Amino acid sequence: MKITKLEKKKRLYLMELDNGDKCYITEDTIVRFMLSRDKVISEEELKEIQDFAQFSYGKNLALYHLSFKARTEKEVREYLKKYDIDENIVSQVIANLKEDKWINDGQYAYAIINTNQLSGDKGPYVLTQKLAQKGISKSTIEENLKEFDFSEVAQRVANKLLKKYEGKLPARALQDKIIQNLTNKGFSYSDAKIAFDELDSQVDEETTQELIFKELDKQYTKYARKYEGYELKQRLTQVLARKGYDFSDIASALREYL
């Protein structure tokens, strides 16, 4: 077979043969096989050219995708599949990129966790979930998590939460709110509790009284329409307890309020 045309088409070249066959190849393919118009190639050479062209095209696409930011093996694999590249070729491209250090799931996991240590607010459970979604293996995630102590991150988040809620919630509700927020962010309950215990959070009696009377004003308006006497007192006690107020503070406030 003889090459009758080599014509540039955007990022690829159109190669035509005298038997009517056509295929798109990369510039790397032309260089590797020293292709030119009128060159004669065999069936075996054509197959080799086509396979390498697919590999070269896939690798170029992957490198373009990686040029914006680091990506995991799963992300690159999914990106290449959008371009209908043969699965075997995709695996070859991935293997080549891993060999050349363009893809390294271990380094990716370490970088994500390290960035979180410096400025993030996520605990190990949420990080594990996010990294797993990126296709990183459980063993790789666990291996990298062992390198870090999350107590400082938990403390940093706890301090921010304290600033947000202090003076707005009674002591028990403040503790519950901060610990719940920490566990939602991926910290274990024990780590969240330790972080809370390290806080300088003292809700004084005056603040508690101010908060409980403010809440009573709101709840009394709601429940006094339907209830009175003992039933009203019980309803108010229940709703205030759910809000995190101690029963002794509730009883004291109700004696004064009703």
UniProtKB/Swiss-Prot annotation:
Protein's gene: recX
GO cellular component: cytoplasm
Pfam families documented for this protein: RecX_HTH1, RecX_HTH2, RecX_HTH3
Ranges annotated as spanning the membrane: none
The protein, known as: Regulatory protein RecX
PANTHER family recorded: REGULATORY PROTEIN RECX FAMILY PROTEIN
GO biological-process terms attached to the record: regulation of DNA repair
Record-annotated disulphide pairs: none
Organism listed in the record: Streptococcus pneumoniae (strain Hungary19A-6)
Compartment(s): Cytoplasm
Gene3D superfamilies: Winged helix-like DNA-binding domain superfamily/Winged helix DNA-binding domain (1.10.10.10)
Keywords tagged on the record: Cytoplasm
Keyword Metal-binding: no
Function field: Modulates RecA activity.
Family of the protein in this entry: Belongs to the RecX family.
